[in-house]
Amino acid sequence: MTSRTKKLKMDEEEILKKEDGSETTSEEEKEEVEEEEEEDKKRKLVKKTPAKKAPAKKAAAKKKSKDEDEDEEEKEEEEETNKTTASVSIAIDNLDEPKVEENQMKIISWNVAGFKSVLSKGFTEYVEKENPDVLCLQETKINPSNIKKDQMPKGYEYHFIEADQKGHHGTGVLTKKKPNAITFGIGIAKHDNEGRVITLEYDQFYIVNTYIPNAGTRGLQRLDYRIKEWDVDFQAYLEKLNATKPIIWCGDLNVAHTEIDLKNPKTNKKSAGFTIEERTSFSNFLEKGYVDSYRHFNPGKEGSYTFWSYLGGGRSKNVGWRLDYFVVSKRLMDSIKISPFHRTSVMGSDHCPIGVVVDLN
């Protein structure tokens, strides 16, 4: 979630200043101001000399392409995540709740921020304890041929799809209940080359596992693509499925729909994931006959997040965003008797797993 990392850090600092309703300056900040004033005095005593311009060739050599910037930022984030995220925890959350009956299906969705990394942090043990019927993974960043069967939880079939660009995006599914069919992508090459969608067909419904494009890792450079191309084509794909049978659309949808879906909405109006364009697009889709299932059961609940920046202890302070969802066809809501849940104590990624239990009758 690279586009929000620096922004969330600034939000955290602002929140910490205002938690008690005051605007007082910390001793550390006072010291920094004093140091800056001292430096200003020193600079005035130094004779100013014009800065030398770098040779054109040297400047050009330093210039990086947009793709190189994104690659470098994603690599830095993954390295930092590996350092700062703990091993997958299974001791705090009661993974036996909610209870799942024979005629029900338990579905878990989790942005793992790198499957290779989470495998080394206790992923298999978590899955064995959680015991989902279907596990949908996003941001797997792995070549399926590099996954070894003996690393995977027993009793599951698994299917992964990678992006054309190595080490980016990607999705995967693990299933105990074998689907009737599996589809990779949505049938449009310009979208499918990023490995963002896997669809499972069951008798009662489709499960659509998705890692929605981020509107921009540096600024909002992909916002137009996200709204005018991806959302248009992907939502048409969902509508086509829904005409046949209900859908369960899950994954990292990269949007905080309303102001209670992130800690600090006022300073994030122009941040990827909370722009009016992204939120409006999501609202318009829901109005066509779909339900944000978590909000259905928890309409006014604040502080329910699924993503936290690893910078500045965002998770421990609960400075986060709700970016992960189970969106379902309205006609399927009678099959969901209890609220979807967030496994906020399960570590290993900057996202937590989310889950839902669906009746199969």
From Swiss-Prot:
InterPro entries: AP_endonuc_1, AP_endonuclease_F1_BS, AP_endonuclease_F1_CS, Endo/exonu/phosph_ase_sf, Endo/exonuclease/phosphatase
Acidic residues: compositionally biased ranges: 25-39, 68-80
Binding locations of Mg(2+) 1: E139, D350
Site (described: Important for catalytic activity): D324
Active-site residues, as the UniProt record annotates them: Y211, D252
Cofactor detail note: Probably binds two magnesium or manganese ions per subunit.
Cofactor(s) the protein requires to work: Mg(2+); Mn(2+)
Region spans: Disordered: 1-90
Domain of life: Eukaryota
Composition-biased stretches (Basic residues): 43-64
EC id: 3.1.-.-
Induction per the UniProt record: By DNA-damaging agents including UV, MNNG, gamma rays, bleomycin and streptozotocin.
Record motif Nuclear localization signal, residues: 41-44
Keyword Glycoprotein annotated: no
Residue numbers marked as site, Interaction with DNA substrate: H351
Site residues by UniProt (Transition state stabilizer): N254
Binding-site residues, Mg(2+) 2: D252, N254
Keywords annotated in UniProt: DNA damage, DNA repair, Hydrolase, Magnesium, Metal-binding, Nucleus
Main location: nucleus
Subcellular location as annotated: Nucleus
Pfam families given in the database record: Exo_endo_phos (PF03372)
Keyword match Glycoprotein: no
Any one GO molecular-function label of the UniProt entry: DNA binding
Family statement drawn from the similarity comment of this UniProt entry: Belongs to the DNA repair enzymes AP/ExoA family.
Protein name: DNA-(apurinic or apyrimidinic site) endonuclease
